[in-house]
Amino acid sequence: MRQSLRTKAIRAVGMKQQTATPNHSISVQLRVYALALLLATFISALHAGILFGLADILMLFRDWAKGALGARPTDVLVVIGAISGLFMTHIAEAAMWAAFFWKSGHMASFADGWYFAGVSHTTLGYGDIVLPKPWRSLGPISAINGLLTFGCSTAFLFLILQVIWQHPL
């Protein structure tokens, strides 16, 4: 029987060849991927809702605080509030991915799931922790979700700054 060049190289180095484990049937894989896509959709929708709510809160605060604090301190606090709200939102989103990776059995602990989710969600991609072979595509799903939410956050923060610059108190 002919061996592939990759198999020969793996045996020569003494590495184990990673293959899909038999207990991960196609139906199980499809369910996990469907759950990941649902989670990505949920996180994106939640993110949009939080942005709308945060915008309302920040503009109400701006209108309320302008008389008490003055224009410049109020605007600085609005920007700080926007950045803080976005930061907490992204932390919560990474925690949702971490819980998914941990509870679905893809990570040994929540801490490992948290680290992997943070690295994937921010598209940092160190690669020091990876998912087993049949599940590797879950990382890019998390990364795409992170790109979309971080893009929305960037646009939101720019919009807040634009409102402050174009409509001074």
Predicted regions and their residues:
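Cytoplasmic (intracellular) domains, linkers, and terminal tails of multi-pass ion channels
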Residues: 1-87, 150-169
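Generic detection of intrinsically disordered/low-complexity segments and helix-coil linkers/edges
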Residues: 27, 108-110, 120
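Hydrophobic positions within alpha-helical membrane elements
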Residues: 52, 95-98, 130, 151
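Single-residue recognition of alpha-helix boundary sites
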Residues: 58, 104, 136-139
